[in-house]
Amino acid sequence: MSKEKKFEENLADLEVIVQKLENGDVALEEAIAEFQKGMKLSKELQASLDKAEKTLVKVMQADGTETEME
């Protein structure tokens, strides 16, 4: 992937994959491939959320108004 996708684009892609798998009308091989893509997207989304949370914590702590989020 030469250009990093935005969080919202990755989330939309994951939602499409989940919908496909929930419908159950895909071949086993395709379902496995889609599941793997979904897991990769899920990890990327979680990493993006973790990074955003750390950024917010730093900003809030620099202001002196907030402590570490859990």
From Swiss-Prot:
Subcellular location, record wording? Cytoplasm
Record GO terms (molecular function): exodeoxyribonuclease VII activity
SUPFAM superfamilies (UniProt xref): XseB-like (SSF116842)
GO BP terms: namely: DNA catabolic process
Short name of one Pfam family for this protein? Exonuc_VII_S
Q: Please give the GO cellular component terms listed in this UniProt entry.
A: cytosol; exodeoxyribonuclease VII complex
Keyword Cytoplasm tagged: yes
Keyword list (alphabetical) reads: Cytoplasm, Exonuclease, Hydrolase, Nuclease
**Enzyme nomenclature, EC number:** 3.1.11.6
**Reaction equations catalysed:** Exonucleolytic cleavage in either 5'- to 3'- or 3'- to 5'-direction to yield nucleoside 5'-phosphates
List the InterPro entries. Answer: Exonuc_VII_S, Exonuc_VII_ssu_sf
HAMAP family (UniProt xref): Exonuc_7_S
Briefly state the protein's biological role.
Answer: Bidirectionally degrades single-stranded DNA into large acid-insoluble oligonucleotides, which are then degraded further into small acid-soluble oligonucleotides.
Oligomeric state and interaction partners are given as: Heterooligomer composed of large and small subunits.
List the PANTHER family hit by this protein, alphabetically. Answer: EXODEOXYRIBONUCLEASE 7 SMALL SUBUNIT
The family line of this record is: Belongs to the XseB family.
Provide the protein name. Exodeoxyribonuclease 7 small subunit
Source organism: Streptococcus sanguinis (strain SK36)
